[in-house]
Amino acid sequence: MRAPARGTGCCGRSGGRWLAGAAQPRCLWAGGAGQRFMVPGGTMKSLKKDSRLRITPTRLLEASENVKEKKRAKGPEQPTPTIQEEPEPVSNVLQGDDILALAIKKEDLKEQHIPRLTEKEDKRVITQKFIIRKLKPMDPRRKVCHLVARPANPDEATKPLDYSGPGDSFDGSDQILPHHILGSLQDFKRIALARGNTQLAERIPTSPCLMTLISAEGESKQKAPKEEKRPPWAPPPQHNFLKNWQRNTALRKKQQEALSEHLKKPVSELLMHTGETYRRIQEERELIDCTLPTRRDRKSWENSGFWSRLEYLGDEMTGLVMTKTKTQRGLMEPITHIRKPHSIRVETGLPAQRDASYRYTWDRSLFLIYRRKELQRIMEELDFSQQDIDGLEVVGKGWPFSAVTVEDYTVFERSQGSSSEDTAYLGTLASSSDVSMPILGPSLLFCGKPACWIRGSNPQDKRQVGIAAHLTFETLEGEKTSSELTVVNNGTVAIWYDWRRQHQPDTFQDLKKNRMQRFYFDNREGVILPGEIKTFTFFFKSLTAGVFREFWEFRTHPTLLGGAILQVNLHAVSLTQDVFEDERKVLESKLTAHEAVTVVREVLQELLMGVLTPERTPSPVDAYLTEEDLFRHRNPPLHYEHQVVQSLHQLWRQYMTLPAKAEEARPGDKEHVSPIATEKASVNAELLPRFRSPISETQVPRPENEALRESGSQKARVGTKSPQRKSIMEEILVEESPDVDSTKSPWEPDGLPLLEWNLCLEDFRKAVMVLPDENHREDALMRLNKAALELCQKPRPLQSNLLHQMCLQLWRDVIDSLVGHSMWLRSVLGLPEKETIYLNVPEEQDQKSPPIMEVKVPVGKAGKEERKGAAQEKKQLGIKDKEDKKGAKLLGKEDRPNSKKHKAKDDKKVIKSASQDRFSLEDPTPDIILSSQEPIDPLVMGKYTQSLHSEVRGLLDTLVTDLMVLADELSPIKNVEEALRLCR
């Protein structure tokens, strides 16, 4: 075998030979098996020995460099040109020993590869014992760290403080979490970026909201794939109720099956199902409790009805009373029935429960069976709504729905033209519609029903429906649903077909405005070859909600079923989408909250009504009506003036009571009644109902009228008050009194109170117009018109004279100061004090005599008169002080003639006598006996008079000064003398 080409397998000059005398390298590697190489200048043994050595490339390069340097060094030493000698011819043929030397031995392979021990070989286990010293770990709790402060080396350069902490303080994560640092991550990142530490800033995660903002700013990022639109009928993803129910139901089934196998019991007898009948038992107990009070045995009689006693918590004074429940008050709630439908029981793996025969349960009690029979009629009346739970079960889904139903009308049996053989053959086809072998002649399987050619056909059957396929669709508006109809040619003849729409009368033809197509399918004509299966796909889609129908006829040639129609009925229901679901939920939550608040409020009100004391009956509306209010109500356009209205009252009494006085003057003429008096009585009888007050007529009952009238008459008899006319309420009660006979004249002397004016000018005018005397009528009309004119004028607003009031108050202060100084002088000089005695004298009806008199009595009294006088003095002094205070409070209202307070002050007036002599001479009183005065020293009396005069001068000087100042402040232009005159 020859050596390989130059430059392959050996290192040296490519394509050349080694120079003479140079160190010739040996072969670095051997060829594969079966190749032999001849190495010049060496033997087989040296080649075998050198083949085991490894020469690195670095050593090879060093050797080549050494050869080149030797060549360069020998160049100048041999100036004479060298004679090139021809090298000896090298034989490239390998000898036998060389071939054996190139063979690979196992020993060489073992030296190159370390042998591995196999698992099958026995391993020698060498055990050695070593003693290892193990230190006891220190308790970390006892470790104490001490910090020792030492002065820093001044030569060391100060380093900036680093607050980032150790490098591995982030729990081995690449990100910096909020609990790694003090403060917020945003501030930390901002400071790191300000310092240029971007590597640290990148380790801070960005919050989702910031990522959203960054992406919204316009970063070119790849958009996420669009989520597939979920159908509107699908529930939200978080509402996986059905999945949870199915998972829990499957776990429950496995659990109860395992328990049933382990305990050797049926599923219905497991302990986990013993409470299934508890609800039914409770309902029956409640129903029996409701019917028990109707029995005569009086069971639960005391605590079950509205006649039961109230329960007290505590005593009757400070405790609480428990109100009755709704059931005790007769407001029983209907019994609620709760059951499990059959499908739920099957789904949960709970069959119909049957109690074991050896168990004596509550239902098998003989007493209960007897009670049921006894109370059966009443229980049926109370619990009349026995619902069938299985019948109330609703099973359905909100997904698009489509269904195909087929009706085969046997109209061919009535065909007169068809033979019995054809009829029998058709029945055979109908019974064996799934026969795979073809039928001779034209034949179709229309929606699974056979439709074949009939030899003889009846013309009457051509308009009859042979096979009707109903396709039903149900979906939401805007959604699409589909259904398929299959037609198979199971005959031996090709059949041509086409579609024709049938016209159906529509009741609401006028109401349909648009004729939009909603059913879609391939209605082109075509041919069905023998053995071919043709599938027609029908689609339905509607943009509006409603019920839609279409009827199509599948026509064939040749005609099948003797000319009967192969009909396809399309019926679809499009439902409205719930686009306001969110708004409805919000509204439902608001209504639920409002309902809860309303229920709580009603419950609280009901509880409070059962606990709180009922409110006191309010006073009637017209209890505080005054004469002015009644006048304004009955005369809206007029204005009330007290003096004018009083004059009208006086005019009424003057002319309306005149006939009554005339009747009293002639007591013997009672039987003779003039026609004028009769006419006047009838007119007054007509006017009497009109005088009644419309305000208080429906509010004051008759017993109260009588009680008030009796109390008024009793007060009149006592004599405490004897007013000339009654109060406003008494007038109303007298007018409303049913005791006054409408047929009697108000002037008849029956002892009844005289009819008063009802404050209505129109009634006044009518009463004046029926007066018999013309002169009286003219005079009354003239005065009435004059009063009406005065009442038509709007009253001027009252202006209070502040200067007059202040002057009067200053004058009263001067008098009080003078009296106080006089009493002080008398006490200092030892003079006797003056006493004032007030006496109440009864006042006659039309006289104004002074009811209160002032008597000055010296201190030197003796006996019973002195004690009596002192007691009367204390009593009357207290009355006087009260009246003075009352007068000071009502000072600003004294000059108001229209004030309401003047009505009660016409009865009493306080008048003081000018002097004691006038009282003793003109109106002597025998009940008072004055004792003789004690002698007074004239010198002391002179000092008293002189001091009193000087005090009067000082008080008057102060009064005049204050009056001048006030006059200048209030009205500087007004004459002060006029104010002084007014004060007098």
Swiss-Prot record:
Keyword Transcription regulation: no
Phosphoprotein recorded as keyword: yes
Superkingdom to which the source organism belongs: Eukaryota
One Pfam family cited in the UniProt record for this chain: MYCBPAP
One GO BP: endocytosis
Ranges of Basic and acidic residues composition bias in the record: 218-231, 862-910
Gene3D superfamilies (alphabetical): Immunoglobulins (2.60.40.10)
Localization, UniProt: Cytoplasm; Membrane
Phosphoserine: modified positions: 619
Tissues expressing the protein: Expressed specifically in testis.
GO molecular function: clathrin binding; phospholipid binding
Gene Ontology cellular component terms for the protein in this record: clathrin vesicle coat; cytoplasm; endosome; plasma membrane; synapse
Signal peptide: none
Keyword entries, A-Z: Cytoplasm, Developmental protein, Differentiation, Membrane, Phosphoprotein, Spermatogenesis
Stored InterPro entries: Ig-like_fold (IPR013783), MYCBPAP (IPR032707)
Modified residues (Phosphothreonine): 613
PANTHER family for the chain: MYCBP-ASSOCIATED PROTEIN (PTHR48421:SF1)
Subunit structure, interactors included: Interacts with MYCBP.
Known role: May play a role in spermatogenesis. May be involved in synaptic processes.
Protein name: MYCBP-associated protein
Organism name: Homo sapiens
